[in-house]
Regions:
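Hydrophobic alpha-helical membrane segments of integral membrane proteins
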Residues: 134, 145-149, 161-169, 174-176, ...
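Re-entrant/interfacial helical elements at transmembrane boundaries that shape
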Residues: 139-151, 181, 305-323, 352
Length: 361
């Protein structure tokens, strides 16, 4: 598929300009409108239910195994004694992650000449988190819901996909930065082992795969091995749609620096939420220990067999925290509080917001 040529490297994409007009607007918009609802079909729901059952079993297994090596009474006391003030601060910090995510979209849309207010984008971000958790698809389902929401707010389909591409690439860059930084810290602390090195290597391959497939499709179309890679990723329809997205936004160093910085802030806010959860229970490890443990746990959840990360995240988080000197009971209590703030709590508004977006458009 061909990409519209951009006449200026610095001029924003205007709705009426040739550069911003897709060559196949109707096809592009129709494809996008049908991709997101399709993710809510019966097959997807059955697959999601299977993922949830496996994830919950793994989650309970992790708790039982951890409690076998620790004290159930001590962990229960830590959770019961959690100070609400610290949890409220943690909730406020966690809310900043949604604002940062919305700013990523806002900056990309502003650069493309289709600005939207932040108050419109923040609810979309919450709906995305909920959709990604309920319909595990490596972030694709939630992203397509946001794209559909942007199109419903009169953002051209091509521009919405371009903004999504910026968000995806900036997220991958930021994720690679924090994982490699965490691995470096563990290396200097003499805590790296073969399993961690293998995990980091797999993560790098997986993280680079989707952007490589997208950019490869734009450059070489359906030639092998790009066609094979897109089929292996299981998101061929989305990748085909992405080939119509302008890449000029990705060639803006300023925009990339801004969006990568915002994505890095999200990781920092998430790790800070975990650190504040430890403050709530009264056992506070060093901030670097919390950050490294959170990032490695997120990495393992990303490359693990369960898309929602239930069980794999908790096991790795507790394991890393224990490896770095935190008691097993405190590690599990802090991790469970974090999951409550970042995983379970957003589902409450997420259900309503996601349904509203689907019914609205």
């Amino acid at each position: 598929m061909s990409t519209p040529q951009i006449r200026s490297a610095h001029a924003p994409l205007r709705p009426g300009s040739d550069a911003s007009r897709p060559k196949r607007t109707a096809a592009t918009e129709t494809g996008l409108v049908h991709v997101a609802p399709g993710l809510l079909g019966k097959t997807s729901r059955l697959r999601s239910l299977m993922f949830w059952i496996v994830g919950l079993v793994g989650f309970l297994a992790v708790i039982l195994v951890v409690l076998h090596f620790g004290s159930l009474q001590k962990m229960a006391e830590l959770v019961r004694s959690a100070r609400p003030g610290w949890l409220l601060v943690a909730l406020a910090v966690q809310s900043a992650t949604y604002i940062s995510a919305a700013f990523v979209w806002r900056e990309a849309l502003h650069r493309a000449g289709h600005p939207l207010p932040l108050r419109t984008l923040v609810p979309l971000g919450i709906a995305k988190v909920f959709t990604d958790q309920v319909l595990p698809s490596g972030g694709i389902s939630g992203t397509m819901l946001v794209v559909r929401g942007l199109i419903g707010r009169r953002v051209p389909a091509e521009i919405a996909m371009a903004a999504m591409l910026v968000g995806m690439v900036s997220y991958d860059i930021a994720y690679l930065i924090v994982v490699l930084a965490s691995a470096s810290v563990l290396w200097f602390q003499h805590r790296m082992n073969v399993a961690l090195i293998a995990g980091v290597a797999i993560f790098v391959v997986v993280t680079v795969a989707v952007p490589a497939a997208v950019l490869g499709l734009k450059q070489w179309g359906t030639r092998a091995p790009i066609a094979w890679l897109s089929r292996w990723l299981g998101v061929t329809t989305l990748l085909q749609e992405l080939t119509d997205a302008p890449t000029r936004l990705l060639r803006s160093p300023r925009l990339l620096m801004q969006t990568v910085g915002l994505q890095l802030a999200i990781f920092v806010f998430d790790a800070l939420t975990l650190w504040l959860a430890f403050n709530a229970i009264g056992e506070v490890p060093p901030l670097w220990v919390v950050f490294v443990s959170f990032i490695i746990a997120s990495m393992v959840a990303t490359i693990g067999p369960i898309p929602v990360g239930l069980g794999t995240f908790e096991a790795t988080s507790v394991g890393m925290l224990s490896l770095l000197g935190v008691s097993v009971e405190a590690a599990l209590a802090g991790t469970l509080l974090l999951r409550g703030l970042t995983f379970w709590l957003p589902m409450l508004p997420g259900v309503w917001l996601a349904r509203r977006e689907i019914q609205r458009h």
